[in-house]
Design a protein with these regions (language model features):
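Short alpha-helical transmembrane segments in multi-pass integral membrane proteins
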Residues: 1-19, 76-143, 189-245, 301-366, ...
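Transmembrane helical elements of multi-pass membrane transporters/channels
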Residues: 17-36, 137, 171, 204-208, ...
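Helix-terminus/linker motif at the lipid-water interface of multi-pass membrane proteins
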Residues: 27, 31-49, 118-125, 181-192, ...
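Hydrophobic transmembrane alpha-helices of multi-pass small-molecule transporters
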Residues: 60-63, 107, 175-180, 209-213, ...
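Short runs within selected transmembrane alpha-helices of multi-pass transporters and secretion channels
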Residues: 69, 73, 138-156, 164-172, ...
Length: 442
């Protein structure tokens, strides 16, 4: 397959053609997140709390997989743009070996720490028991999760977005179908409760791996995975981690943020912890859609950067920013229009619904301006400037928001914590523009 279309096709149609499959995939994936949480919420509010507390650890596992995949994607795209397909293949082969190593380490580590982690944020034995039961199954599928994301990034790097869309959508649909069947024991299926939710998720991750492997075999791509490249491509390991580690930290920071916010909010009420968990499920519908656009942008911007098309790189950034802003504006409108109805999908507790409605109206004030940070961070990753991207994520997830949340909680209680989100987005957007411009000028 000839990837030169990434520097020859007009930018807007190219970006739409690359991003649209990912946006559709992300929308389906977001729907899965919401549906999955909806079914877990039907078990009990304790089950929803357990899921919320396990989420940061799950997010960390995903962060390692996606972050390393972003580094892999950037390196492959760069070498394809430079016309060096062998180096791209070496990167892909090294990436697969390292992905499997990461999976083994994270499986063992997650299973060892999860109970102690849960006890840091809850004294309820019911919640802890539910969280451990869920975790013991979900983390056994870590190798499938990481293999899934590895192949996704490789196919994206060569512009095969429809393949990744197909894999993601089928996996999500399988998950959505299995959720009610094995959570509640419908028909011949056993009633597994919260373990059923974990099993459905795991099977949903295995499915696209099988699809990707079959497509890789029957419709070969220009990037080859070969055993001999393990030896030849050793010099690329450092480059993969140079981009991948900052990207991993970028994506892992929300885990730290959620855990820290859980600690701040738990002082006031367990309902605040539930609301935070629900918010992060809902916001995936908006942010994953914007991330779909950014994923479509990364291989294009990396390819053009490798090909020396710097004016085109700037245009790609600007159009991506506008597209992300439109998505965030739509998300803001929805959250302001029906905040309590959205929270009501996951809880019947009047206090949780009331607090959740307040949270959504306050947090959504920062959605639109966050498009600047999202686009800048993604563009920098695509350009191979992971360190600069990390600065933006540190501002959004640690440096600004945690002190703001802590101070605001002491000024006005748990409800004031939600203001920290939009304040952070405004400050981070300004920092993002400065960081991006300086990084690109170097």
């Amino acid at each position: 397959m000839n990837e030169n279309f990434m520097k020859e096709k007009p930018v807007f149609p190219l970006l739409v053609s690359m991003a649209l499959p990912m946006v559709i995939s992300m929308l389906v994936n977001s729907l899965y997140n919401i549906v999955d949480s909806f079914f877990v919420a039907q078990i009990s509010e304790d089950a929803m709390t357990a899921l919320s507390l396990v989420y940061p650890v799950q997010n960390f596992v995903n962060a390692v997989a996606i972050g390393f995949g972003i580094g892999l994607n950037a390196v492959i795209s760069y070498y394809l743009g430079a016309g060096d397909k062998k180096a791209a293949g070496c990167a892909a082969t090294q990436g697969l070996a390292l992905t499997m190593l990461h999976a083994v380490i994270l499986t063992i580590g997650s299973l060892l720490v999860i109970e102690r982690f849960l006890r840091m944020f809850s004294s309820s034995e019911t919640v802890i028991n539910l969280g451990v039961r869920y975790s013991r199954i979900i983390f056994l599928f870590t190798i499938a999760i990481m293999a899934n994301l590895y192949f996704e990034k490789v196919f994206q790097a060569v512009g095969r977005m429809k393949v990744t869309m197909t894999g993601m959508m089928i996996g999500c649909i399988v998950n959505i179908i299995l959720d009610p069947l094995i959570i509640f024991g419908i028909g011949p299926f056993p009633r597994l409760g919260i373990e059923g939710a974990a099993l459905a998720t795991g099977i949903g991750q295995v499915t696209p791996v099988v699809i990707y492997w079959i497509i890789y075999k029957i419709r070969p791509i220009s990037v080859k995975i070969r055993p001999e490249y393990l030896k030849e491509g050793k010099n690329l390991v450092g480059r993969l981690y140079a981009i991948g580690v900052p990207a991993i930290l970028n994506l892992a920071l929300p885990s730290l943020l959620i855990s820290a916010l859980n600690g701040i909010l738990a002082v006031y009420s367990q309902s605040y912890v539930v609301v935070l968990g629900i918010y992060y499920k809902l916001q995936t519908f908006i942010y994953l859609t914007a991330n779909g656009i950014v994923q479509g942008m990364r291989p294009i911007i990396g390819f053009n950067y490798g090909a020396g098309e710097h004016k085109r790189v700037r245009k790609i950034y600007e159009i991506t920013l506008i597209m992300c802003a439109v998505i965030m504006l739509i998300g803001t409108g929805i959250c302001l229009a029906i905040p309590e109805q959205l929270i009501g999908l996951f809880s019947s507790n009047p206090e949780t619904i009331r607090l959740g409605g307040q949270a959504l109206t306050r947090i959504s004030a920062g959605f639109l301006i966050s498009a600047v940070s999202i686009t800048s961070s993604g563009a920098l990753e695509g350009l191979g400037k992971g360190g600069s991207s990390l600065i933006i994520s540190l501002c959004r997830n640690v440096i600004v928001i945690l002190p703001a949340a802590y101070l605001l909680s002491h000024l006005g209680g748990g409800v004031f914590v939600w203001h920290a989100f939009w304040i952070t987005e405004v400050i981070s957007a300004a920092i993002s523009l400065v960081v991006y411009r300086r990084a690109v000028r170097r």
